[in-house]
């Protein structure tokens, strides 16, 4: 029996069709006619643009002043060395799990190699660095030659040109383009599926391949999460502070964030925990990520849950995503409070 719908069908099926190495095929169904491509295209774009990876963005080689120099005792010149370096895929172990979108996250590693040897990517493995493609050739070092160099590896997403990374480099480092995306390829297909005898429903099949820095299924889930957060601003219950316009510091609810933590009526244990690390204002808590808050010394589960509940009551759940303008405006407001000794 045909019915006139008043709401679209909600997809209920997600299946892993194939999984081999760093490649996966996933199907999602059923979608109303026209919905599949509407969702599949932005998810594909977000996989390519928002997936987080690692890349070298700074290089310092002993005795080298610019990328057109030659390397004494090394077959490859500096340009070829850099090209080979960019083809190596890294994981910076110290940065795994750290998610602070507005702070630079990097690690510096130093290397020294003596010839004769074929320097391959696997030789760069260390307590700080894991190499995904270990057999890549980096350089050929001749007998009696030595190659000393340092790398700055950043965590990031997308592509960042050297004009930008140049501003992050200490003296003596050559800036490199940063190609962070761990996604090698992502395509999708739309197929028709039968639902209760009706063929006018659709299925999305994603084919995702990564370079090994991230599991493809995790990359997919991460992209969906990003999409959900981006769309959250339009929901019936918008995420906190979405009505931002102009100077955030002038908004009425910004006053809540400049209140001292005493106003939250926290237990003595919670208050002491925050006081010991210098947290004075509610806004400082809002600026902290979930990981940062949980990582506070002596912050047990009960204390964390208490703080999370209080922040939620204020309309700022732990991990609330503020825009760059909001964060900067809030930071400036808090700095002014510090300068005034807490009197606003």
From Swiss-Prot:
Keyword Transit peptide appears in the UniProt entry: no
GO biological process, one term: DNA-templated transcription
Keyword Nucleotidyltransferase assigned: yes
A GO term for molecular function: DNA binding
GO cellular component, one term: cytoplasm
Reaction(s) catalysed by this chain's protein: RNA(n) + a ribonucleoside 5'-triphosphate = RNA(n+1) + diphosphate
InterPro entries the record matches: DNA-dir_RNA_pol_insert, DNA-dir_RNA_pol_RpoA/D/Rpb3, DNA-dir_RpoA, RBP11-like, RNAP_asu_C, RNApol_insert_sf
Keywords noted in UniProt: DNA-directed RNA polymerase, Nucleotidyltransferase, Transcription, Transferase
Cystine pairings recorded for this chain: none
Record region (Alpha N-terminal domain (alpha-NTD)): 1-238
Protein EC: 2.7.7.6
Stretches for region Alpha C-terminal domain (alpha-CTD): 253-344
Family to which this protein belongs: Belongs to the RNA polymerase alpha chain family.
Domain notes: The N-terminal domain is essential for RNAP assembly and basal transcription, whereas the C-terminal domain is involved in interaction with transcriptional regulators and with upstream promoter elements.
NCBIfam families, per the entry: PRK05182.2-3 (NF003517), rpoA (TIGR02027)
HAMAP family: RNApol_bact_RpoA
Quaternary organization: Homodimer. The RNAP catalytic core consists of 2 alpha, 1 beta, 1 beta' and 1 omega subunit. When a sigma factor is associated with the core the holoenzyme is formed, which can initiate transcription.
Job of this protein: DNA-dependent RNA polymerase catalyzes the transcription of DNA into RNA using the four ribonucleoside triphosphates as substrates.
Name this protein carries in UniProt: DNA-directed RNA polymerase subunit alpha
Organism of this sequence: Helicobacter acinonychis (strain Sheeba)
Lineage of source species: Bacteria, Pseudomonadati, Campylobacterota, Epsilonproteobacteria, Campylobacterales
């Amino acid at each position: 029996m045909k019915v006139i719908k008043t709401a679209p069908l909600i997809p209920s099926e997600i299946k892993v069709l194939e999984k081999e190495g760093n490649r996966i095929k996933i199907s999602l169904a059923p979608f109303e006619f026209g919905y599949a491509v509407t969702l599949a295209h932005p998810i594909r774009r977000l996989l390519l643009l928002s997936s987080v990876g690692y890349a070298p963005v700074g290089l310092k080689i002993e005795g080298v002043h610019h990328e057109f120099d030659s390397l004494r005792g090394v077959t490859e010149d500096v340009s070829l060395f850099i090209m080979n370096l960019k083809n190596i895929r890294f994981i910076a172990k110290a940065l795994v799990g750290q998610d602070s979108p507005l702070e630079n996250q990097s690690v510096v590693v130093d290397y020294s190699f003596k010839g004769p040897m074929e320097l391959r990517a696997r030789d760069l493995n260390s307590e700080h660095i894991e190499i995904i493609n270990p057999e890549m050739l980096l350089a050929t070092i001749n007998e009696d030659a030595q190659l000393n160099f340092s790398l700055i590896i950043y965590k990031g997403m997308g592509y960042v040109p050297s004009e930008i990374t140049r501003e992050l480099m200490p003296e003596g480092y050559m800036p490199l383009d940063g190609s962070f995306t761990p996604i090698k390829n992502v395509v999708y297909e739309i197929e028709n599926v039968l639902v209760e005898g009706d063929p006018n429903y659709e299925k999305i099949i994603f084919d995702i391949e990564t370079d090994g820095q991230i599991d493809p299924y995790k990359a997919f889930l991460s992209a969906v999460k990003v999409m959900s957060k981006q769309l959250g601003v339009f929901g019936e219950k918008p995420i906190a502070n979405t009505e931002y316009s102009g100077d955030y510091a002038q908004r009425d609810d910004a006053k809540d964030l400049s209140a001292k933590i005493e106003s939250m009526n926290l237990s003595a244990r919670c208050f002491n925990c925050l006081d010991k690390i210098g947290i004075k204002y509610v806004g400082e808590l809002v600026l902290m990520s979930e990981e940062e808050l949980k990582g506070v010394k002596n912050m047990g589960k009960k204390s964390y849950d208490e703080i999370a509940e209080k922040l939620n009551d204020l309309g700022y759940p732990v991990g609330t995503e503020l825009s760059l303008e909001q964060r900067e405006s809030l930071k400036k407001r808090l700095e002014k409070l510090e300068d005034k000794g807490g009197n606003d």
